[in-house]
């Protein structure tokens, strides 16, 4: 094709474009009305977003005599529904089903275990309903509850929570439960933010689980290199009418981390902690991953030990992970070692 022939094609396209422009000017009002209707339809079609997650996990525990080890394979399916209420408010729901390999019955129950609204009241962000409550890595609290979250700020955020345990919470391993149960109440206040290479948080917890408990948490993370981070936390707790130790700590390293959208990405982490029973409520480590290394949390006065883990993105939206826990009671000679493995699919 010669340049002249190409120029003729361009000239015809420009002429048609000019005709379209003239027609658009002539029917501007009608097109505007049509545009409003089309935009409204597009907005309506995007009003609800549905996503999902499927996780297959296996837990293998080796614990002292008398401790329920909890070895099991589990297939957990979650469907998330997020809808727009208006320009300022959204609704989020989560349906969950669990299938276990260590029983011979069908696990057909599907539970709606998230149901909350999110929005702003003035400059304050608010979430209200049934949802997960966790912060600062979940080393004190990582549980589901019915309540409200309030937060204010950008780089430095102040937050307050009030919640009670929902009726579908799992029980702790062992004969003495140290997890949140239906109706247990927890109140949290804190401040946190990012200051250069350091992120820090200070939190206060007040709970009526087992007995009245007050916990102060100071946590910080320092970026040592591009993907390497040093984490640490100090805890001071007071469990009413007990003479348990009051001070605990955690120190750890984190390197990078698997990203579901980036094939081949990976990460490693390692933590060591010493946690008297007065310094935690429902930590992430004991909320289903590791077997608690005691039969009675008071006699054991909590736990100490280390946790290591790794994750790797096998394919887009498919991430494999492994965790190993070696924990022992702070008092007595009970212990528990747990190997947790999982593959997570998101869609």
Spans of model-derived segments:
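N-terminal periplasmic/intermembrane-space "pro-region" immediately following the signal or transit peptide
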Residues: 1-55
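Outer-membrane beta-barrel pore domains
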Residues: 2-3, 17, 22, 38, ...
């Amino acid at each position: 094709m010669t340049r002249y022939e190409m120029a003729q094609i361009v000239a015809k396209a420009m002429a048609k474009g000019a005709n379209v422009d003239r027609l658009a000017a002539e029917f501007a009002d009608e097109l505007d009305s049509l545009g409003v209707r089309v935009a409204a339809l597009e907005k309506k079609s995007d009003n609800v977003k549905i996503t999902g997650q499927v996780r297959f996990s296996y837990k293998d525990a080796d614990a002292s005599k008398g401790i329920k080890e909890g070895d099991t394979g589990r297939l957990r399916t979650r469907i998330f529904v997020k809808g727009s209420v208006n320009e300022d408010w959204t609704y989020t729901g989560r349906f969950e089903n669990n299938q276990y390999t260590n029983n011979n019955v069908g696990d057909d129950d599907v539970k709606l275990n998230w149901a909350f609204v999110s929005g702003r009241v003035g400059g304050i962000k608010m979430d209200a309903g049934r949802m997960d409550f966790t912060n600062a890595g979940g080393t004190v609290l990582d549980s589901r509850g019915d309540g409200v979250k309030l937060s204010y700020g950008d780089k430095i955020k102040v937050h307050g929570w009030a919640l009670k345990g929902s009726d579908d919470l799992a029980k702790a391993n062992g004969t003495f439960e140290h997890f949140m149960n239906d109706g247990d109440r927890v109140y949290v206040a804190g401040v946190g933010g990012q200051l250069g290479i350091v992120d820090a948080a200070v939190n206060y917890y007040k709970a009526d689980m087992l007995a009245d408990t007050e916990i102060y948490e100071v946590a910080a993370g320092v970026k040592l290199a591009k993907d390497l981070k040093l984490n640490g936390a100090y805890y001071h707790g007071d469990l009413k009418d007990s003479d348990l130790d009051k001070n605990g700590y955690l120190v750890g390293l984190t390197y990078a981390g698997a990203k579901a959208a980036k094939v081949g990405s990976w990460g490693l982490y390692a933590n060591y902690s010493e946690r008297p029973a007065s310094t935690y409520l429902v930590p992430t480590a004991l909320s289903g991953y590791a077997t608690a290394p005691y039969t009675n949390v008071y006699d054991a006065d909590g736990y100490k030990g280390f946790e290591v883990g790794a994750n790797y993105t096998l394919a887009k939206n498919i991430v494999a992970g492994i965790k190993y826990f070696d924990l022992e009671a702070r008092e007595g000679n009970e212990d528990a070692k747990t190997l947790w493995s999982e593959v997570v699919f998101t869609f």
